From Swiss-Prot:
Keywords: Cytoplasm, Magnesium, Metal-binding, Nucleotidyltransferase, RNA-binding, Transferase. The gene is pnp. Its cofactor is Mg(2+). It is an enzyme of class 2 (transferase). It comes from Chlorobium chlorochromatii (strain CaD3). This is Polyribonucleotide nucleotidyltransferase. Belongs to the polyribonucleotide nucleotidyltransferase family. SMART domains: KH (SM00322), S1 (SM00316). One of its GO terms (biological process) is RNA processing. Involved in mRNA degradation. Catalyzes the phosphorolysis of single-stranded polyribonucleotides processively in the 3'- to 5'-direction. It comes from the Bacteria.
């Protein structure tokens, strides 16, 4: 059954949702169109019953942009799309984070959502359309789903908010924020801002939510016309006797442990001991009372003997204990107040060969951040359907397994690392200098050495400090903080600088970064329904206070960027040469420019407009490269003195001297010396270096070639009457 519905987003933007034409064998499929950008989303959920005791939802979200959608060919030898790009991974994460909380609790059936951009006008981005299409595909399927979810992008140009701004409007916008939500609540935020206030942030969220509500209604209308009944799903019900026995064995011990301020490692060891002892006692108890025949005949009794189910119940008790401790007594696992930030230590310049470095430690989270400065050649190439450019500021985030005391495989970078690095990069790039102010390519690398919550925000702080340590003239320092939330009915508590356990057992992870004057980036994931705006407002204000506290600590370590670059950082020198001289500097097959690099140790980049950038760690190398380039591009001028090399000797005519690269002139036999020269070879030989003066430039009327007349004699100092040379 084909159904199509559309809505006006404002400013003449018509968005449509259709289903029933494509991918009809999937459980659900929908196409969302805005302008000439079309996104197809499909969803399939396995009907195979998951194993008893499975405690996770195997949801896979894939977002792909096809070059054919814009009438383009992929790069590479095979001319075929390969592994997902960074943008595709980030877009998939946006959609996953918004959709995952909306599936029913206990729904553990393998589910795959594939979003494909099948048409692109290269103006309207497909990422937020993909989230809307994915939700619409689920809504028209038989998969159980709580509420429709919609994603929008909010921009602001000249003070006016815009829903789903195009790429040209985004260039002028001071806000680029993606919002995912249902009719009742916001469940996901991510974006970058140009130092906006908390009030402006809230306005942008509310503006976006108004559009989200309309899009959710549109999805419901489409789903109502399709009218596909939902498949039966009955969540696992935990037997009362199992819940009671587990509580009796571990609740008091977990409460006592929760009220004891401990480090992460010691708490984990004690918690594991309680888990193991409770699990053993529970299994022993129910194995004594339930026979194998009863377990096979009665699912409820089988649950009492399932180790995964028992561990889930212990975990539920642990979560309940911690949440009530925070809500009822305003106490946290490490003994801090709700709005208190962990102790901070900062060390700068630890890595001698890096161009800037910082070791930022906050509680049990530690980031070693290094800065590398390079040239335009080191910029990161970005090529997707809406953007083809070179990034000259980027941040890479690494999270090795030892940072949480675990063994793990090392290999390709995971989606989480890409996402965390992107958030930290967006946080800092708003204060990075422009290319005109600082013509370097800037790479920041954050290696997480310890982690107990908020490692991405540690990367923001460490990245800022590394830039300042390296002498990069940032506009203002940036800090970041992760906020948490515990909410039961109308009672709630907002937590500053959350621990890993508080993130895991809480209801919200809200990361906010910015300067003293405003927010530069944010990311929020909500695990509950019904998040009120006054809670977001309180969280933003509490985050502002925490952010300012961290900035104070950072400024104690380094109040401003250093005035000089690091010893081993390249020094950049820029000159402009005529465009028609570019080939002369590069040489045949790059021979000339390679020769300059080998001789001087300098790296040379030439732009199409003739701008030459010389990068070298030594002044001597820079000066040598600069002199060579100037000589290569110099124009011969009568009266100038040059040092040249004899290329050819004609005994009765004179000597040909290369006084500029690829430019020869003739020193006539009469211009070699003020005394009579009988034979040129008696005075000059091929390969000799000589100082000459350009005395004449003329065109050969027969050939049209320019000829240069040089003189050595003209440089001889005139003799005084006593025969002595004049001293200048």
């Amino acid at each position: 059954m084909f159904v199509q519905k559309s809505i006006d987003l404002g400013h003449g933007r018509i968005l449509s949702i259709e289903t029933g034409k494509m991918a009809k064998q999937a459980d659900g499929a929908a196409i969302v169109r805005l302008g000439d950008t079309m996104v197809l989303a499909t969803v399939v959920s396995s009907k195979k019953t998951p194993p008893l005791g499975q405690d996770f939802f195997p949801l896979q979200v894939e977002y792909r942009e096809k070059y054919s959608a814009a009438g383009r060919f992929p790069g590479g030898f095979f001319k075929r799309e390969g592994r997902p790009s960074e943008k595709e991974i980030l877009s998939a994460r946006l959609i996953d984070r918004a959709l995952r909380p909306l599936f029913p609790d206990g729904y553990y059936y393998e589910t795959q959502i594939i979003i494909s951009v099948i048409s692109s006008d290269q103006v309207n981005d497909g990422d937020v359309l993909g989230g809307l299409a994915a939700s619409a595909a689920i809504m028209v399927s038989d998969i159980p789903f709580q509420n429709p979810m919609s994603e929008v992008r909010v921009g602001r140009v000249n003070g006016l908010y815009i829903i789903n701004p195009d790429v040209n409007e985004l260039k002028e916008s001071d806000i680029d924020m993606c919002i995912g939500g249902t009719n009742d609540t916001i469940c996901m935020l991510e974006g970058e801002m140009n130092e906006i206030s908390e009030t402006e942030m809230l306005e942008a969220i509310q503006f976006g939510h108004t559009a989200i509500r309309k899009l959710c209604v549109l999805q419901q209308e489409v789903a109502a016309e399709v009218a596909k009944p939902k498949r039966l799903f009955v969540p696992t019900v935990i037997p009362t006797e199992l819940d009671s026995f587990v509580r009796a064995n571990c609740q008091s011990r977990l409460r006592e442990l929760a009220y004891t301020p401990l480090g992460k490692e010691e708490r984990a060891e004690r918690t594991a001991a309680i888990y193991n002892e409770t699990l053993a006692a529970t299994l022993e108890h129910f194995r004594a009372t339930i026979s194998s025949e009863e377990a096979q005949a009665d699912t409820a009794k089988a649950l009492c003997l399932n180790e995964h189910i028992i561990e889930d119940q212990i975990h539920a008790v642990e979560k309940e204990v911690m949440r009530h401790m925070i809500l009822d007594d305003a106490k946290r696992l490490d003994g801090r107040a709700l709005d208190q930030v962990r102790p901070i230590t900062i060390e700068l310049g630890l890595i001698p060969r890096a161009h800037g470095s910082a070791l930022f430690t906050r509680g049990e989270t530690q980031a070693l951040v290094t800065l590398t400065l390079g040239t335009q050649k080191d910029a990161q190439s970005v090529d997707n359907l809406t953007n083809s450019d070179d990034k000259r500021f980027y941040l890479h985030y690494n999270f090795p397994p030892f940072s949480v005391g675990e063994c793990g495989r090392l290999g390709s970078i995971g989606r989480r690392e890409i996402g965390h690095g992107n958030l930290a990069e967006r946080s800092i790039k708003m204060v990075a200098p422009t290319e005109a102010e600082f013509p370097y390519t800037i790479r920041i690398v954050s290696d997480i050495l310890e982690s107990n919550g908020s490692s991405s925000m540690a990367s923001v702080c460490g990245g800022t400090l590394a830039l300042m340590d390296g002498g990069v003239p940032i506009r203002k320092p940036v800090s970041g903080i992760a906020m948490g939330l515990i909410k039961e009915n109308d009672k709630y508590a907002v937590l500053s600088d959350i621990l890993g356990n508080e993130d895991h057992l809480g209801d919200m992870d809200f990361k906010v970064s910015g300067t003293r004057d405003g927010i530069t980036a944010c990311q929020m994931d909500i695990k509950i329904d019904g998040l009120d705006y006054h809670i977001v407002e309180n969280a933003l204000e509490q985050a502002r206070k925490g952010r300012l506290h961290i900035l104070n600590e950072m400024e104690k370590a380094i109040p401003a960027s250093r005035t000089d670059l690091a010893t081993y950082a390249p020094r950049l020198t820029t000159i402009k040469i005529p465009s028609d001289c570019i080939g002369m500097v590069i040489g045949k097959g790059g021979e000339t420019i390679r020769g300059i690099t080998e001789e001087t140790g300098a790296e040379i980049n030439i732009a199409d407009d003739g701008t030459v950038t010389i990068a070298c760690t030594t002044k001597e190398g820079t000066d040598a490269a600069l002199a060579t380039i100037k000589s290569l591009t110099a124009k011969p001028e009568v009266g100038n003195i040059y040092v040249g090399k004899v290329r050819d000797v004609r005994d009765e005519l004179g000597a040909f001297v290369e006084f500029l690269p690829k430019t020869d002139g003739l020193v006539h036999i009469s211009e070699i010396s003020s005394t009579r020269v009988a034979k040129v070879s008696d005075h000059l030989k091929v390969g000799d270096k000589v100082t000459v003066k350009l005395v004449d430039v003329r065109k050969d009327p027969r050939t049209g070639k320019t000829k240069f007349a040089l003189s050595i004699k003209a440089l001889e100092q005139p003799k005084q009457e006593g025969g002595e040379a004049t001293q200048n």
